[in-house]
Amino acid sequence: YIHGKTGIDIHPAASIGRSFFIDHGTGVVIGATAVIGNDVKIYQGVTLGALQVDKSLANVKRHPTIEDNCILYANSTILGGRTVVGHDSVIGGNSWLTESVPPFSIVLHQSQVKVRTKPFEEPVNFVI
């Protein structure tokens, strides 16, 4: 019911600390064994998910731990039960994280778009 109203999926077994804040929550997914510390902020499209799904893993920690005072920006994906985001860290938008990062980390996704690799033979005139 609530997913239909908010677009947010938080498994009821997830552990969430005090002063947890979701801004623009559409697309947020928080798995069953996720642990979120105090004073954590997350933005739209963030996934705290598992690396794999199997019935044999039902009683195993499959989702990440986010320690206190972290910010997870839009569309960041953090996967795995052994993945820990250390306290006071920032995970930038569109980041993909499957390994732990220490406290006070800043993780960024940098897209590299190469438009052209060889120089123009003549000057290019653009008319706008």
Describe each region flagged by the PLM.
Residues 6, 11-12, 17-18, 23-32, ...:
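Left-handed beta-helix
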Residues 53-54:
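PLP-dependent aminotransferase-like
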Residues 1-6, 119-128:
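Terminal amphipathic alpha-helical/low-complexity segments used for targeting or macromolecular assembly
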